[in-house]
Amino acid sequence: YTLTVTLLQNGKTVDEIATRFGCRSFAIDPQKGFILNGKPYPLRGVSRHQDRPGIGNALTAKEHTEDMDLICELGANTIRLAHYQHSQTFYDLCDERGMVVWAEIPYISRHMPGGKANTISQMTELICQNSNHPSIVVWGLSNEITMNGASDPSLLENHRALNDLVHKMDPTRPTTIAVLSMCDPGE
């Protein structure tokens, strides 16, 4: 759906904004798996980077649609949008095609103790810009962030802060992280 809000002054439009939204329900159950609109919905997924040879990240609607068509041709119904905010065009395509989306911020590979403010800003913007997309069902906090180990107290604190922020801004969606197992078993 598209919701349009118009600001009138003396009967004339002085501002107008439109936003897309949709309605759905989901649950994640340890025994039943992913449940979409009350029914089991097995997830078959891909991970997507938003780039192409020769044009980098400057994809047009044509390339986004080509990517979505290929993803659908594979039979996928789930997309992890790695590792950064993607184009609104692609989020809209995900909504239109009924995809289940994992959206995440660029908090990748190695934790930078001085980078907390940046991760908080990135997550805030991701949620503010995309919370109306019904295709997004999970917010990703980080990707393979334990490459230097998982025992750094500031890494753990940053994840707690991000997790708390997400649940404050959007209590309807869970959080997740992608983990690379390069940690000692004791960490």
Labelled PLM ranges:
Residues 4, 8-160, 175-176:
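Active-site-adjacent substrate/metal-binding segments within catalytic domains
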Residues 146, 156-187:
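Extracellular glycoside hydrolase catalytic/binding regions
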